[in-house]
């Protein structure tokens, strides 16, 4: 969930400067963030629906890998309004789509009695990722005059997150029963 936080904070914090540096009109980042917000709703509902029918770990792997593809598309193709729209739609669809399957895995493995506490603990990793995505994005920009290393790191994190979810055993842990 750390990677989710990294992606979200990096994009939300630095997309205006990134797009300005690429020479896109001033209104383009606002449009991209609005598209992210709109398509986030559809993506989150869709991932929640899919998480009730398919492997949650595979859904999470797909989401993170697709985020990497979306970032690759966005940073390696020529900057344009069209490519910005495609990024806003695709990244928006994937934005918080990690939440339902992540929460589902926690509930499935550990049960629902303490799901609030356990998800709170999981969410701390999201917030650490958010801090680092926003902060290090700025550090990379100050050191290099661009966001290249922040984007490359985001792609690497996408691959890592896509792979790290695959070994998860989606099975409830055995609980000891009191005598």
Name these PLM-found stretches.
Residues 139-157:
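A membrane-interface helix-boundary motif in multi-pass transporters
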Residues 97-110:
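Intracellular juxtamembrane helix-capping segments at the cytosolic ends
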Residues 44-55, 141-142:
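Helix-to-loop junctions at the C-terminal end of transmembrane segments
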Residues 1-47, 99, 133:
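Extracytoplasmic gate region of multi-pass secondary transporters
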Residues 66-79:
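C-terminal ends and interior cores of transmembrane alpha-helices
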Residues 153-179:
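Multi-pass alpha-helical transporter architecture, strongest
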Residues 53-64:
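Cytoplasmic membrane-interface "Motif A"-like loop-to-helix N-cap segments
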Residues 2, 83-97:
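Hydrophobic core of transmembrane alpha-helices in multi-pass small-molecule transporters
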């Amino acid at each position: 969930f750390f990677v989710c936080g990294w992606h979200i904070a990096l994009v939300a914090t630095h997309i205006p400067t990134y797009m300005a540096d690429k020479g896109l009109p001033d209104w383009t980042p606002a449009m991209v963030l609005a598209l992210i917000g709109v398509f986030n709703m559809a993506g989150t509902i869709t991932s929640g629906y899919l998480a009730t029918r398919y492997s949650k770990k595979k859904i999470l792997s797909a989401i993170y890998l697709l985020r990497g593809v979306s970032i690759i598309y966005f940073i390696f193709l020529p900057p344009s309004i069209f490519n910005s729209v495609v990024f806003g739609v695709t990244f928006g669809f994937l934005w918080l789509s990690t939440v339902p399957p992540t929460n589902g895995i926690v509930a499935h493995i550990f049960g629902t009695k303490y799901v609030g506490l356990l998800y709170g603990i999981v969410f701390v990793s999201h917030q650490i990722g958010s801090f680092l995505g926003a902060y290090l994005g700025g550090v990379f920009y100050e050191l290099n005059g661009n966001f290249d290393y922040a984007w490359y790191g985001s792609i690497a994190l996408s691959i890592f997150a896509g792979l790290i979810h695959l070994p998860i055993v989606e099975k409830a842990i055995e609980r000891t029963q009191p005598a």
